[in-house]
């Protein structure tokens, strides 16, 4: 149940006790060798996903209630659990099974076109986004009270702590509209500013509900009650790590002052408010890219238990049409290379190739920095895939170490390019033995998505 400095001290004490002969059954394992084995398994299977206990707990809003020992399957939910207590075979105290009600905002629906000096461009309508955030938080809080709970432990946890997980999707679609490459410094700045706004308004929306309906049962003693917001716990985490915080902290001073003052006076309706789920299924249903992920490619096949779905990047097609280059012949060429435009010589302008690179050709370190810019504003975590275009364990070590240094709470799949070839036909039924199973551990083992997080 320990983490942070307490774990460091207890671990060192245990090692010393073993050295002194007080512990008999133990063996020494070089840390580097153990880490290499973990990386090798990750490369071969994409599992197990790496999550970081210290960030999850040092930043946990309800740490006075318990320790975060694990996440959900998709690694965006980081809540504590408690075992039920028994005496003589009878349950004497109902424990807590962490559950969280999820919802995701389609950011592309908040992008509007404007004309300036005869030139058109796109911008995010933040007034509309604010309204959507407040509506979504209210909706998710309502779900807590009308939901079905399969166990008493799940009901106990959800009704006491009232966590919700409001996320986003279509981030890369919006970046395409704004002509920003997802793995650029401009993208890092954009994500920092966007998620600061999203964090401030989500917190404020929950506090407004607290004024109307009362704060959640275990609010007293939480980080919220101590005026420690997600950005504050992020700074505490980076100080513990000895790392410099990313960015400049709160930039929307007036909005944060209103939010902090409201929480101080009325509390929070929900112990946790924000979490970025994968949203693959609902994202593709809505015709947008999942969650905060980069486009996998401009053309690929998405599989779930309902079948195979042909996913195309409409932004790419629109850009090609604007250049007068889109044709059935070009479409066939793109299909022949599995949507990897770098394999086409002379058929597509270089700027389009750069804009629509596959996820494997992106700068992974920039994508990690983008995610760190998001994570610092969130009270829960982000389902975040890593894309590997290398066979080097050193490279894997470097990207996972960068995740840890950046203050990320969790990572999701390690996607390896060699294992991600796209089928060239959508009409042929897949003969793969690793069929996808909705909402199950088997789906995860077979490379599928957990559809409960969609």
Where are the model-predicted features located?
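Polar, glycine-rich mid-to-C-terminal structural blocks
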Residues: 1-45, 53, 239-242
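Flexible loop/turn segments at secondary-structure boundaries
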Residues: 5, 49-51, 57-62, 108-112, ...
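Acidic, low-complexity intrinsically disordered tails
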Residues: 425-454
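Structural signal for hydrophobic packing residues in well-ordered secondary-structure cores
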Residues: 15-18, 38-42, 106-109, 129-148, ...
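Alpha-helix capping and helix-loop boundary segments enriched in small/acidic/polar residues
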Residues: 25-29, 39, 65, 89-97, ...
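Internal maturation/activation junctions in enzymes
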Residues: 4-12, 132-155, 159, 181-279, ...
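Catalytic alpha/beta core of large soluble enzyme barrels
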Residues: 75-81, 140-145, 215, 246-253, ...
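Function-dense linear segments that define catalytic or interfacial modules
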Residues: 42-158, 168-178, 288-315, 319, ...
């Amino acid at each position: 149940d320990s983490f942070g400095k307490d774990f460091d001290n207890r671990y060192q004490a245990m090692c010393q006790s073993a050295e002194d002969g007080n512990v008999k059954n133990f063996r020494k394992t070089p840390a580097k060798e153990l880490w290499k084995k973990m990386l090798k398994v990750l490369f071969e299977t994409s599992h197990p996903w790496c999550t970081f206990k210290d960030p999850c707990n040092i930043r946990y809003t309800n740490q006075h209630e318990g320790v975060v020992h694990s996440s959900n399957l998709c690694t965006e939910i980081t809540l504590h659990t408690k075992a039920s207590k028994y005496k003589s075979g009878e349950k004497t105290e109902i424990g807590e099974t962490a559950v969280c009600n999820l919802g995701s905002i389609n950011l592309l629906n908040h992008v509007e076109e404007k004309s300036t000096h005869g030139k058109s461009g796109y911008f995010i309508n933040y007034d509309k986004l604010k309204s959507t955030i407040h509506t979504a938080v209210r909706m998710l809080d309502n779900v807590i009270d009308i939901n079905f709970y399969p166990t008493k432990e799940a009901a106990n946890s959800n009704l006491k702590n009232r966590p919700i997980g409001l996320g986003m999707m279509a981030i890369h679609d919006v970046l395409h509209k704004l002509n920003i490459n997802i793995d650029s410094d401009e993208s890092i700045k954009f994500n920092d500013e966007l998620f600061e706004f999203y964090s401030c308004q989500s917190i404020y929306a929950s506090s407004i509900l607290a004024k109307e309906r009362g704060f959640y049962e275990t609010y007293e003693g939480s980080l919220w009650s101590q005026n420690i917001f997600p950005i504050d716990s992020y700074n505490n985490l980076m100080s513990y790590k000895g790392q410099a915080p990313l960015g400049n902290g709160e930039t929307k001073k007036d909005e944060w002052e209103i939010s902090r003052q409201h929480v101080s006076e009325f509390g929070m309706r929900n112990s946790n408010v924000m979490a970025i789920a994968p949203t693959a299924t609902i994202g593709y249903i809505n015709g947008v890219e999942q969650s905060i992920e980069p486009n996998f490619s401009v053309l690929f096949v998405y599989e779930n238990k309902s079948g195979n779905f042909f996913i195309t990047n409409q932004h790419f097609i629109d850009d090609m049409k604007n250049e007068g280059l889109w044709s059935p012949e070009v479409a066939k060429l793109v299909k022949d290379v599995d949507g990897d435009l770098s394999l086409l010589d002379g058929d597509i302008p270089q700027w389009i190739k750069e804009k629509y690179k596959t996820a494997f050709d992106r700068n992974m370190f920039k994508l990690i920095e983008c995610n760190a810019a998001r994570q610092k504003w969130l009270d829960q975590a982000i389902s975040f895939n890593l894309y590997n275009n290398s066979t080097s364990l050193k490279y894997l070590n470097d990207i996972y170490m960068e995740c840890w240094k950046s203050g990320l709470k969790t990572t999701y799949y390690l996607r390896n390019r060699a294992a991600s070839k796209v089928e060239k036909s959508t009409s042929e039924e897949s003969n793969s033995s690793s069929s996808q199973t909705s909402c199950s551990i088997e789906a995860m083992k077979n490379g599928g998505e957990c559809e409960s997080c969609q």
